[in-house]
Swiss-Prot record:
Gene name in the database record: tuf
Gene Ontology cellular-component terms listed: cytosol
Signal peptide: none
Subunit: Monomer.
Region annotated G5, chain positions: 174-176
Protein name: Elongation factor Tu
Family: Belongs to the TRAFAC class translation factor GTPase superfamily. Classic translation factor GTPase family. EF-Tu/EF-1A subfamily.
Binding site for Mg(2+): 26
Catalytic activity, EC: 3.6.5.3
Region entry G1, spans: 19-26
Molecular function GO labels: GTP binding; GTPase activity; guanosine tetraphosphate binding; translation elongation factor activity
NCBIfam families with a match to the protein in the record: EF-Tu (TIGR00485), PRK00049.1 (NF000766), PRK12735.1 (NF009372), PRK12736.1 (NF009373), small_GTP (TIGR00231)
Native species: Pseudomonas savastanoi pv. phaseolicola (strain 1448A / Race 6) (Pseudomonas syringae pv. phaseolicola (strain 1448A / Race 6))
């Protein structure tokens, strides 16, 4: 079968299921594709196919992730589901599958469990902006008061981690019933349809990359005689046009320059857009004033920083990571976008050491400033070998 053309007419939103092991994340994922295929005509994906998720690599780390898609009336959803807890941690920290919103699946029969809490905390740390709750397995709970109790517990937990617990939509249902095409007490297909409608209404349409302020990590710098200095890279977001004022941020003092030309595949263009690899010609900037690892940005939008809090995942020995734990004062290289910068780690109070395979919050101090914002991803390296991954949770200085 020929690949279907990607439908650009519907706005595109990235979501994913999070929650404790065996609370029904994968069943709900399969049920979503089934219900949407029947109601809105998107393709159906079976449980087994989602459960045997293929491996993929992100920032040197292997992660198992299943990707499915489905449509509502007004949107196209790309949905990620991970088989194991470690895969979630890695996925969220590396940003392999960035989410515009998450569906927290919690078993009504068991209530919130340790991974329920951990996934909410991770969502907060890595900047997942919206969470919608699906209280699953409600067909196994006869007591309405018990359902209410679990709902209150989930709301409290969300509020603990600065999500709006009282206003978070909670849908009660049974993913298994929906997957089997049943709908007793409107707990099956109706509940899943309601979930899709809630995703439509509660998760706002994400700002398109081209509408965000311009940012391009600098990969290479060339000097072209008679024309000046050209920096090349892939535009991460926004648009750069000829004559735009720009700033060069990171590693040294911020400098101001102007775009005098944009090139792609040796052709001159009027502008460079998000996702494109291009060269930007800079007025009055010398070849030695710029280096790989800096970023080219719209003036005033990004600042350089050296101190931040981060959520990190440390690779296990089996994943090619360290064989031994590290302690406070650990000094690896932090790889941001296109370059390594050395930094030292402070551990949270009461944490003596960090073992391979752990995820932990650390405070980092870099020896040189890097252009950064909350949510920026990085790799942790020792002599060019990836030993971990992280995300900036909060900038300190």
């Amino acid at each position: 079968m020929a690949k279907e053309k990607f439908d650009r007419s519907l706005p595109h939103v990235n979501v994913g299921t999070i929650g404790h092991v065996d609370h029904g994340k994968t069943t709900l994922t399969a049920a979503l594709t089934r219900v949407c295929s029947e109601v809105f005509g998107s393709a159906r994906v079976d449980f087994d196919k989602i459960d045997s998720a293929p491996e993929e690599k992100a920032r040197g780390i292997t992660i198992n992730t299943a990707h499915v898609e489905y449509n509502s009336l007004t949107r196209h959803y790309a949905h990620v589901d991970c088989p194991g807890h470690a895969d979630y941690v890695k996925n969220m920290i590396t940003g392999a599958a960035q989410m515009d919103g998450a569906i927290l699946v919690c078993s009504a029969a068991d209530g919130p469990m340790p991974q329920t809490r951990e996934h909410i905390l991770l969502s907060r740390q890595v900047g997942v902006p919206y969470i919608v709750v699906f209280l699953n397995k409600a067909d196994l709970v006869d007591d309405a008061e018990l359902l209410e109790l679990v709902e209150m517990e989930v709301r409290d937990l969300l509020s603990t981690y600065d999500f709006p617990g009282d206003d978070t939509p909670i849908i009660i249902g049974s993913a298994r019933m929906a997957l089997e095409g049943k709908d007793d007490n409107e707990m099956g297909t109706t509940a899943v349809r309601k979930l899709v409608e809630t995703l439509d209404s509660y998760i706002p349409e994400p700002v398109r990359l081209t509408d965000k302020p311009f940012l391009m990590p600098i990969e290479d710098v060339f000097s072209i005689s008679g024309r000046g200095t050209v920096v090349t890279g892939r535009v991460e977001r926004g648009i750069v046009k000829v004559q735009d004022p720009l700033e060069i941020v990171g590693l040294r003092d911020t400098t101001v320059t102007t775009c005098t030309g944009v090139e792609m595949f040796r052709k001159l263009l009027d502008e460079g857009r998000a996702g494109e690899n291009c060269g930007v010609l800079l007025r009055g900037t010398k070849r030695d004033d710029v280096e790989r690892g800096q970023v080219l940005v719209k003036p005033g939008t990004v600042k350089p920083h050296t101190q931040f809090e981060a959520e990190i995942y440390v690779l296990s020995k089996e994943e090619g990571g360290r064989h031994t734990p590290f302690f406070k004062g650990y000094r690896p290289q932090f790889y941001f976008r296109t370059t390594d910068v050395t930094g030292s780690c402070e551990l949270p109070e009461g944490v003596e050491m960090v073992m391979p395979g752990d995820n932990v919050k650390v405070s980092v101090t870099l020896i040189k400033p890097i252009a950064m914002e909350d949510g920026l991803r990085f790799a942790i390296r020792e002599g060019g070998r990836t030993v971990g991954a992280g995300v900036v949770a909060k900038i300190i200085a």
